[in-house]
Amino acid sequence: MANRFVLNETSYHGAGAIKDIATEAKGRGFKKAFVCSDPDLIKFGVTKKVIDVLEGAGLDYEIYSNIKPNPTIENVQTGVEAFKKSGADYLIAIGGGSSMDTAKAVGIIIANPDFADVVSLEGVADTKNKSVPLIALPTTSGTAAEVTINYVITDVEKNRKMVCVDPKDIPVVAFVDPEMMSSMPKGLTAATGMDALTHAIEGYITAGAWELSDMFHLKAIEIISRSLRNAVANTPEGRADMALGQYVAGMGFSNVGLGIVHSMAHPLGALYDTPHGVANAIILPTVMEYNAPATGEKYREIARAMGVQGVDSMTQEEYRKAAIDAVRKLSEDVGIPADLKAIVKEEDIPFLAQSAYDDACRPGNPRETSVEEITELYKSLI
């Protein structure tokens, strides 16, 4: 069986990368951008950095800002209608996963009118046409949505997140500019950074992992582990390293899938609006313990990538514990809570467990699981 790997056509990396947006847009014959960016990024002038480049090059644009954290079906549908009226011929997504996921959904629906709304795109969608061309500019170091074939939209009425997978939605160009991430507060830097680490670790041990994805994931674990503390301290070196590390993780997990850390985090975002990275960070060590028997020697390599010394002389039990302890220590150092006590209500656990089991990420978990086992994992975290 062949392994597919889908990446951007082009990506730019490094401080000042956004200056090349106009060159790319003009070179591709684009005329008017539909710019997806959330209200806070507009308010604090982050979006303006990109708009200034467009205006300086004489490129037309329209801004769409009806985007919430954990974007909803309504955010997508109003975006589709706004795009139709705008006369735009391409999309620019500026932000974290929320802006990019909204833009991906809009682009796919516009290009595939047979799919009336995002609900019909849940799972692995059988679309025929590539998305409206999308240029992605991340402002967080975590989701890697600029290089993935996935997007996640919240169904508010049913309190659930829909995971949509479509290789036709990947941005054609990504601009990974650490200067666009420098305004992130410490808490957001920590949460998105732990999200990136979760991508790397889950992608490394997922059932679909193979040699090429393993290369990306181990390198991402190494980069993120050495740089997240510095990024939280807002050093330029830390920001640059995290921008790269989260992108490398995205290159991997987008092509092989994730596991039940994400399955368990998704309903927390849908029900409580919990920040995705915080949920992942809290759940990750507990699920690593649960998954350990199904991971062979991979935790030895995780521990090594996280800077643990002497792993070659450790027993299996020792290196597995060392890897999990290293994850817990990093999460603690960047200020992530240790449990879900302040988030989860015990009476909601049956709903959460069933939602997690039904989640599209669950089949990728290296260890077979059940609703009952996921229930116990949630209970252990409160």
Enumerate the language-model features and the residues they cover.
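Glycine/threonine-rich beta-strand-loop-alpha-helix active-site module
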Residues: E74-E179
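Catalytic phosphate/nucleotide-handling subdomain of diverse soluble enzymes
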Residues: P267-M306
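Carboxylate- and glycine-rich phosphate/diphosphate-binding segment that chelates Mg2+/Mn2+
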Residues: N150-V256
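N-terminal small/polar loop signature for handling phosphorylated ligands or for N-terminal nucleophile
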Residues: I42-F115, R229-R239
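Short glycine/serine/threonine-rich phosphate/pyrophosphate-binding segments
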Residues: I18-I21, K43-V46, I73-V76, S99-A103, ...
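An N-terminal, well-structured beta->alpha segment
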Residues: M1-Y64, L381
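C-terminal charged capping/lid subdomain of soluble metabolic enzymes
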Residues: Y299, Q309-I382
